[in-house]
Amino acid sequence: CCTPFYFCCNN
């Protein structure tokens, strides 16, 4: 999962 901006989940 990732946000459409910057941060991404550690998935």
UniProtKB/Swiss-Prot annotation:
UniProt GO cellular component terms: extracellular region
Q: How is it modified after translation?
A: Contains 2 disulfide bonds that can be either 'C1-C3, C2-C4' or 'C1-C4, C2-C3', since these disulfide connectivities have been observed for conotoxins with cysteine framework V (for examples, see AC P0DQQ7 and AC P81755).
Subcellular location(s) per record: Secreted
Highest taxon of source: Eukaryota
Entry's Gene Ontology molecular function annotations: ion channel regulator activity; toxin activity
Q: According to the UniProt entry, which residues carry Asparagine amide? A: 11
UniProt keywords, alphabetically: Amidation, Disulfide bond, Ion channel impairing toxin, Secreted, Toxin
Where does the entry say this protein is expressed, by tissue? Expressed by the venom duct.
Domain-related comment: The cysteine framework is V (CC-CC).
Q: What function does this protein fulfil?
A: Probable toxin that inhibits ion channels.
What's the protein called, per UniProt?
Conotoxin Ama1309
